[in-house]
């Protein structure tokens, strides 16, 4: 029955916990079939109500200091490629690029400023941090962030190793770094790819308790290596919306168990990045060399440029850019 399919499709998109908090939604789940148009209308009405509550909920949590909100460039562009499409050659020198270079750093600046401005209008305060789209960074894009007054950015650990031209070192990974230039300075945090990807792609197939136990054991092994030194920052960064639909119960059991374990273990403390930077300022004498150009996908930009159809799209974009705003 088409009506049953419509209702179930929209019911399934409502989180199990949210369904459990609404008596009528719970009853519809129990009913299971022979839904009415009124049932469908109620489910769609709840969709609108839940969506309307998202921004206020985030705003309230940020005001309590429970979370930190960041922004990204406005339309999710790959900033380094807007600055200069040849930046793709830094990671992949042999990559076939479009014959005409796309170079509009002013567009990258606009995208960044619009993201910051929209965030401020929506949440009442300008964010201190920026997650560049797809963790895509370059020296030129980082300077734009400095000029915009951004305090910190984050990206993948692969960018750190390629910037420093070194192999993986936990003592290097688990501290913020500084980009210090004549035009300003910017803190950079690099995510632990292994720990982040365990949550993003692996633990969804595990029993929640076993997954949390494994994660905590990994944290314990790291903590044992740094007991005598200053506090370290282990950055867990992943797409916030993608993982949970693959977990049982939308990840509620895993997340509740994880936060309970972290809250009860005095060796660990959950912090926002700005909170850590305020308590443990970045060493002013420890500035990174020129930031490597790449993303959190294999440390390069091949996802967005370098294939025939993508190169053609960049040429069309360049033609449109030149025609509309020469």
Label each PLM-derived region with a short phrase:
Residues 69-72, 128, 152-155, 189, ...:
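Hydrophobic faces of well-ordered beta-strands that scaffold small-molecule active sites
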Residues 73-76, 129-138, 274-277:
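Short, solvent-exposed turn/loop segments enriched in Gly/Ser/Thr/Pro and often Arg
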Residues 63, 122-123, 139-154, 252-265:
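Short, surface-exposed basic-aromatic patches at helix termini and helix-loop junctions that form
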Residues 1-27, 168-326:
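Active-site and substrate-binding clefts of carbohydrate-active enzymes
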Residues 1-92:
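N-terminal catalytic cores of secreted or lumenal carbohydrate-active enzymes
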Residues 32-49, 94-108, 126-133, 198-213, ...:
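The substrate-binding groove and active-site-proximal loops of carbohydrate-active enzymes
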Residues 89-109, 146-181, 187:
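Acidic, His- and aromatic-enriched active-site or binding-groove loops in soluble protein domains
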Residues 94-132, 219-237:
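CE4/NodB-like, metal-dependent polysaccharide N-deacetylase domain
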